[in-house]
Design a protein with these regions (language model features):
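A recurrent domain-boundary module in secreted/ectodomain proteins
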Residues: 491-527
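Surface-exposed, proline-enriched loop/turn segments that connect beta strands in immunoglobulin-like
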Residues: 530-534
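Extended ligand-binding clefts on enzyme/binding-domain cores
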Residues: 1-2, 32-498
């Protein structure tokens, strides 16, 4: 439901800006209201509020029957799936038993309840009541999963080990669902990546701004005794404070190395090296770095309906970086919404800069200082990524991924002859063959890239910016052939989702702070890059085109 809720969120924004009254051609016939279609999508995501097989929440029994609202957890689960026969003679549909903090979207739930155009698009009986309950339940989940440090822990499940087994003794629960450090995926764990934090909490910060600035509906959150705005503030204050303490503008003056288990099931420890912030930071005005990966320890308390400090639930930073520009931008987006909701104005930037440069820890800052520092940090992240990584295409970082050796080393393993087909014949692995849609042959032992030959890029469409004259694939293969790994392979990508998050963060800054200068000195740090350098322009006979800059000729 992540993408669906984002779409609903986008339509809600459009409606708030007064530009959402649009229609699109629809397969359901004629021009359809975008808001009505978003409401219809809300109807459909109600299935994400159910257990995979609609079994009762907390049943812990694989033989338990499903099929009633007892199987409704009101959270956004990991997926919905459906299918059936081509002739329509039968069909199936499932929900999911696992709920990740990353996939919750209280802003979308709030929009479906409170935006009249979106709400009118929902036709299912009880849809409004379901999303009212879902909004409250999602907020309770975030309160339950907030660590002692600030970041949000993994999630919960109604199906232990995917088999509805009994929960382990002492396992923390949330409305009879068991805590999971890494819901859905364990290899690698699903809640290491910092993107889970910044994407999820951006929605909370935007919702906080909406409720605070629009004199909007501010309902109670379950039995917590907190209004929605109060619950959001409790989460955001600690979360923002943690990022304020652990984001680097400049470069740390030293490093520290330690060992820890990356996954809960690891038998050996991994060595990590990260910046040592205790040795201070030297700000060169250009560099920046944010936490990139976390490991988790402990678990939350059992949820009893009211917020409790989770003193036994902690996280540790095991990676830093500046190359994940989508995450950097989403963090900036979050900080900007938080600052605006707290009442920080553009005119406060001088004080915000001073406050940030003189800060010690977030816990020592007043509410006003933390909000001002938030705006300053958000703006600095946007300015620095723009100045450091902008090129003639967009924003791109020279990246590195040692796992790319798996392109050639990971082999397809087909059945070894122990499986029978429908004709009751035992087939050897050599008999299991087929063809991919692109024509690649599927057979036992072929490499990952052999059935994805489009990666080989024989057309030269994807040239390497890091090794002139070679395609990205040929350059990677050359590095692999030379050393048996891709440790020396670097590549520059302009990822679509990075570009999307960058544009949305810049848009948020313009929406909330339209008078904010691009850089502190009011002058862009780079001239516009135009490629190619010679451009032919055709104008009508009645028009005269004249350059307005010296040195320009036509």
């Amino acid at each position: 439901p992540d993408a669906e809720d984002r779409a609903i969120q986008a339509v809600y924004d459009a409606n708030r800006w007064g530009v959402g009254d649009q229609t699109v051609d629809s397969k359901w016939g004629g021009g359809q209201s975008i808001s009505a279609l978003a409401g219809k999508m809300g109807d459909e995501t109600r299935n994400n509020m159910y257990d995979k097989y609609y079994k009762a929440i907390g049943c812990q029994d694989k033989w338990a029957k499903g099929g009633s609202d007892n199987g409704k957890h009101y959270l956004m689960n990991w997926y919905t799936s459906w299918g059936g026969a081509m002739d329509g003679s039968w069909a199936w549909q499932i929900g999911a038993s696992h709920c990740h903090e990353f996939y919750q979207n209280p802003l979308a739930a709030y929009a479906l309840v409170n935006d009249s155009a979106l709400n009118a698009g929902m036709k299912a009986q009880g849809a409004t009541e379901d999303f009212e309950a879902s909004l409250s339940r999602q907020m309770e989940l975030y309160l339950w999963l907030m660590s002692k440090d600030g970041p949000i822990a993994g999630g919960c499940t109604n199906s232990w080990n995917g088999r509805y087994e009994q929960y382990p003794s002492g396992q923390a629960t949330f409305y009879n669902m068991a805590y999971l450090e890494h819901p859905v995926y364990a290899d690698p764990g699903s809640n290491h990546w910092i993107g889970n934090q910044v994407w999820a909490v951006q929605r909370l910060a935007e919702l906080y701004y909406v409720v605070k600035s629009d004199n909007a509906n501010d309902p109670q959150v379950g039995k917590t005794g907190l209004k929605l705005s109060e619950a959001l503030e409790k989460i955001l204050d600690r979360w923002v404070g943690w990022f304020m303490d652990n984001t680097i503008l400049g470069k740390a003056n030293g490093e520290k190395t330690f060992s820890a288990k990356y996954e809960p099931y690891d038998t050996t420890e991994t060595e990590f090296t990260i910046p040592d912030l205790s040795k201070g930071i030297t700000d060169d005005g250009e560099s920046f770095s944010i936490p990139s990966s976390l490991i988790w320890s402990g678990q939350p308390n059992d949820w009893k309906g009211t917020y409790q400090d989770n003193n036994n639930l902690t996280c540790t930073i095991v990676g830093y970086g500046d190359g994940d520009l989508g995450c950097v931008s989403s963090l900036a987006n979050t900080l900007i919404y938080y600052a605006k909701a707290k009442g920080v104005a553009t005119s406060d930037m001088a004080a915000a800069k001073t406050s940030y440069e003189n800060k010690t820890t977030a816990s020592a800052a007043s509410a006003t200082e933390l909000a001002q520092q938030s705006l300053y940090l958000g703006k600095q992240l946007l300015d620095r990524e723009w100045n450091k990584y902008r090129d003639d295409i967009g924003l791109g970082v020279s990246d590195h991924n040692t796992n790319l050796k798996r392109l050639w080393e990971t082999k397809l393993a087909l059945p070894d002859g122990t499986r029978a087909n429908g004709e009751n014949k035992v087939l050897s692995a050599s008999r299991y063959t087929g063809t991919m849609p692109n024509g690649d042959t599927v057979k036992d032992g072929v490499a990952f890239v052999d059935i994805r030959s489009n990666y080989k890029d024989t057309t030269g469409e994807y040239m390497s910016k890091d090794a002139n004259g070679k395609t990205m694939y040929d350059y990677a293969k050359e590095c692999y052939d030379a050393k048996g790994n891709t440790d020396d392979y670097y590549f520059t990508l302009h990822r679509f989702w990075h570009a999307g998050d960058i544009m949305m963060a810049l848009g948020t800054m313009y929406e909330l702070y339209p008078d904010m200068s691009v850089n502190d000195d009011d002058t862009p740090s780079k001239d516009l890059v135009v490629t190619p350098s010679d451009i032919e322009i055709t104008v009508g006979e009645s028009e005269t085109l004249k350059p307005n800059q010296t040195g320009c000729t036509f």
